[in-house]
Amino acid sequence: VIREETLTIGTVNASLCSPRDVFIRSLQAGASAVLVMHNHPSGDPSPSGEDIRLTRRLSEVGDLLEIPLLDHIIVGDRCYYSMKEAGQLQISKR
């Protein structure tokens, strides 16, 4: 890990994050890969439709920039959901 950053602070049920925000900071840090994490204050780490869409978009942009998205982890109450472990994230083999 070369850098940990808070990109946004959301409300109880929403947060806005764009691939642009993620990858600008990744490029500035000279990152070779990215891991994204956020929490669900409800305690249920199940991904929302927006979480899944964001993961797909981050993966697409990461592939274009050759900075792969390693995982998108959602933290709940004493549990987590890994998009990679759930098979919702395909890591590009470059």
Regions found by a protein language model. Name each.
Residues V1-I2:
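Hydrophobic "anchor" residues
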Residues T8-R94:
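Active-site-proximal loop/helix of nucleotide/amide-processing enzymes and allied scaffolds
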